Amino acid sequence: MTTTVPVKTKYEAIIGLETHCQLSTQTKIFSNSSTEFGATPNTNIDPICMGMPGVLPVLNEKVLEYAVKAGLALNCEIALYSKFDRKQYFYPDLPKNYQISQYDLPIAEHGWLEIEIVEEDGNATRKKIGITRLHMEEDAGKLVHGGSDRLSGSTYSMVDYNRAGVPLIEIVSEPDIRSGIEAAEYAQELRRIVRYLGVSDGNMQEGSLRCDVNVSVRPVGQKEFGTKVEIKNMNSFSAIQRAIEYEIERQTEAIETGEKIIQETRLWEEASQCTVSMRTKEGSSDYRYFPEPDIPPIEVSTQQLDTWKAELPELPAQKRYLYESKLGLSAYDTRVLTDDFNVAKYFEAAVAAGGNSKQVANWVMGDITAFLKNEKISINDITLKPDNLAELVTIIDDGTISGKIAKDILPELLSKGGSPKELVEKKGLIQISDIKAIEAIIDEVLAAHPEELAKYRGGKTKLKGFFVGQVMKKTQGRADPKMTNQLISKKLEG
């Protein structure tokens, strides 16, 4: 008897990402105009970025530094000698009708980064994704379409050249990615790295991080790649994942029905949750690259390389390894804590001040993160210092206060700061841990509720929670919960 192999197991996706990352320099790559986001259209421009006759571009050295640091963080080989090239194409947002980029001698090549896919059980699957190259280039302007939310229905277009000449690094991955979730995690890890380095804010909504995805599908076991399709217009990590999943499905169905896949560029439409054809894909020969005549070759000295390498911070992957191996945290916890550099810094400072690592992690990931989201602030804005959080964790652990009391006073600590221990003493919230004192309160509660006591002893054992609640009410939550539970059980059975 023959069986049909499910379509999804017959094919595999081959995926690569081209990620454009705006660098956080104060001025543009080849001129002194500001890179400020959100300025009035066409105010941050100058003769150089507009390509006026007779102007000469000069490389912003900070761009070179940031590009090299990004290359080092991605385990790339840094080119001590590289150059810029002109990429020729015609589009309204490109004032010079060419883009200054790097073609055959990029600043960095042959790197890799490791991604982690956290499973439902909290463990992580790790995979290395190769980096083909990293190169420097200038950004283009921005077209603003009017008359419709969609390009196809717009009745007019305007161009803002403020973005023209803003420095970019383009990071090209090897085709090592096999799913939408791997691609989304790769893009997120890139953002973590550039943010840790301080070379970019990685804000996708403002266009500081833009990903183009190349997807092809081939039968499992086939060595040759299928026809590649490029996808653009994804402004979130979830959109990257969904666009890839849709495109894999589309190409698989096309192959199954005998349809030919066309090499083209497609746009992801968020509203319809599908990709639509934009244009046929150009090859590098269509851009007529040639060396940029107005900018001399770039040379990186060994002294510069050593200096920039020494300035690299501890990166997300290094922190995750240390948190798991040294602090015993789960893959999920380490992922959450290292997603933001400042959160990781705060966590480490609290642990260094003596806080139990797991308890500190729980407070940072739970109540503190909820407070930050509610107040729309960052962890740098709270007045609860890391050593105060360590103190809070310690006085819970040593029985000075209960976890409930800690939750009650946390909002005040987050908004006003100060010593948790002093606040607890001032408010008279120190936990009651004296056995005789708690027994006396339990006796009062039982005497005041004879009906409930009779019902409990008649088989309604769930009423134990009622008695615990009454004790907590009388003590304003100060009775030691563990001791209270034990003593009530003993009294009820007596």
UniProtKB/Swiss-Prot annotation:
* Enzyme category, top tier: ligase
Q: Which Gene Ontology BP terms does the record give? A: glutaminyl-tRNAGln biosynthesis via transamidation; translation
Disulfide feature: none
Q: A Gene Ontology MF term for this entry?
A: asparaginyl-tRNA synthase (glutamine-hydrolyzing) activity
What UniProt keywords apply to this chain's record, in alphabetical order?
ATP-binding, Ligase, Nucleotide-binding, Protein biosynthesis
A Pfam family recorded for this sequence = GatB_N
Q: Cite the InterPro entries for this sequence.
A: Asn/Gln-tRNA_amidoTrfase_suB/E, Asn/Gln-tRNA_Trfase_suB/E_cat, Asn/Gln_amidotransferase, Asn/Gln_tRNA_amidoTrase-B-like, GatB, GatB_C_1, GatB_Yqey_C_2, Gln-tRNA_amidoTrfase_suB_CS
**What catalytic activity is recorded?**
L-glutamyl-tRNA(Gln) + L-glutamine + ATP + H2O = L-glutaminyl-tRNA(Gln) + L-glutamate + ADP + phosphate + H(+); L-aspartyl-tRNA(Asn) + L-glutamine + ATP + H2O = L-asparaginyl-tRNA(Asn) + L-glutamate + ADP + phosphate + 2 H(+)
Q: What is its EC number?
A: 6.3.5.-
Q: Report quaternary structure and partners.
A: Heterotrimer of A, B and C subunits.
Could you say which protein family the record assigns here?
Answer: Belongs to the GatB/GatE family. GatB subfamily.
Known role: Allows the formation of correctly charged Asn-tRNA(Asn) or Gln-tRNA(Gln) through the transamidation of misacylated Asp-tRNA(Asn) or Glu-tRNA(Gln) in organisms which lack either or both of asparaginyl-tRNA or glutaminyl-tRNA synthetases. The reaction takes place in the presence of glutamine and ATP through an activated phospho-Asp-tRNA(Asn) or phospho-Glu-tRNA(Gln).
Quote the protein name from its UniProt record: Aspartyl/glutamyl-tRNA(Asn/Gln) amidotransferase subunit B
From which organism does this entry originate? Trichodesmium erythraeum (strain IMS101)
